Amino acid sequence: MQGELLGSVASELGLKKGTPVTYRAGDQPNNALSLNVLNPGEIAATGGTSGVVYGVNGKVNYDTLSRVNTFAHVNHSADRTRLGVLLCINGVGILNSWVKRNVAPEGISYPALNELAATVPIGSEGLSILPFGNGAERMLQNKQVDCSIHGLNFNIHNKAHIARAAQEGIVFSFKYGMDIMNEMGIDIGVIRAGNANLFLSPIFRDALAGVTGTVIELYDTNGAVGAAKGAGIGAGIYASAEEAFASLKKINVIEPDGLKADKYCGAFEVWKERLEKALA
């Protein structure tokens, strides 16, 4: 327990004076907790306005270029190292939203946008998008690359190609950052995520599983649930984290499709080459 609620604060919040304060965390460690990501090798991810891959490391390690952030996870202790390694990409869902508002047919829904993108083959017939239009990216050593479209051919590409290339570009940025995490000794075999935001897109899920070779597990949970569970664990309402998350419901599993892997990896290499030229 970290303290008790003061009377002045309790009255503002409509809570009882003396309520125990047993848990606090940043948004991504809390999201990881909501997915029961607590032990070395376990991975949580989000795909909102920005995107995050958050892994737990059981040993002290860091990226010498500071492209990812390392800090104590919610269950770290002096005798049991549990460090969170956070990869953050600013230009994720915000790019997909931009395409929906400015490129796709007016009034289109996100499911319809996904269906439009699905009419285009993997690799978007040579079209690549670097999704870095939401500020400098830490994983690119804080360089301001901006968003850019590469390989555009007026005789081949249309709105559907841009819709698919945007999601593939987002996925490839995840892959680029996950390779940095791999260099730190974090082996990413399974990604856990809430069933929300870009993880609702079949194209995004399929591409992420395909290019990284990871299994994606989707759960019916969110950060608010994680915070409540964390407070319950701290207050002793649950005897253990295992008890707290016994009811966590897995609702979908996406396996890498071996028949598509080469196509995704080939498209990633084209994308990566274009990124490296932009960084030069």
Predicted regions span which residues?
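Active-site core segments that coordinate phosphate-bearing ligands/cofactors
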Residues: G7-R192, N197-A280
